Amino acid sequence: MNRKVAFITGASRGIGAATAVQLARFGYDLAITARTMSEGESHEHGSWQSNTAPLPGSLESTAERARAEGAQVLCLRSDILDLDSVAAAADGALAHFGRVDLLFNNACYQGPGNMQRVLDVELAQIDNIYRGNVQAPVLLVQKLLPGMLARGNGAVINMVSGSAINDPPAPADEGGWGFAYPSSKAALIRLMPALRVEHADSGVRFFSVEPGFVYTEVMRANGLDEKIAARFNATPPEHVADVIRWLAEDDAALEHHHRAVIFAPQLHGKLFGE
């Protein structure tokens, strides 16, 4: 029996890594991408100002955990700000596995501009945010969706944000959020209804998932402590991974296909009682 193949961006840590391991456990082989191939590498991840301190997690560590679950794993270094590397990763996955059954656009731009006020954010930063959060996912859809359509099945799942659909409670530097990042995620949300109507009855499912507040390595590195995270009732990455797997696999998930955004913590509670 052929194993399905999932293509996951931002799989070196957090939700991406948890989803990779969960899908491996349920019989998927994996093409996983991120900037960080090995532990200890340095990449930009500061939302307010530049921060290149190494973060825990890497493609190699995710692959080790997924292989322990029986998966074949292809690690592909890719930066969503470098669209050539994004295209090369998709081509590499297709060349290696011959197919992709699930595209999980999980990676998002990490860098200055995400949390700036409108009068402070630079246009070059907005360019980066939209390249990483909109253009890169669309490029992957253009690369990987045709094969799903030809087979008559598959799934495209985008990770979005509550900031794209809710008003900020305060300015970006006072506990709220800025304009550029939420608007890019709003664009990503609007991608899915377009795909649904363009490919109705194709056998391919399209979902946008809002993970809730997930306390990630990036947040920790940028100064958000565990006490604040606890106050926001943080969602474990593994719970989001459970939801991603269910949406991609279960026929009952099609009951949610019309919804603009799936709120992962709420759906997880209904499905798994936690």
Task: Go through the PLM ranges and name each one.
Residues S12-R13, T36:
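Conserved glycine-rich cofactor-binding loop
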Residues F26-S61:
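Conserved glycine-rich Rossmann-like NAD(P)H-binding loop of the short-chain dehydrogenase/reductase
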Residues D201, S208, L224-E274:
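C-terminal helical subdomain
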Residues W48, T52-E60, Q110-D127, P168-D173, ...:
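Conserved mid-core segment of classical short-chain dehydrogenase/reductases
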Residues V141-Q142, P193:
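A short, exposed helix-loop element centered on a Lys and neighboring polar residues
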Residues Y109-Q110, D120-A124, A155-D201, F213:
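Catalytic loop of short-chain dehydrogenase/reductase
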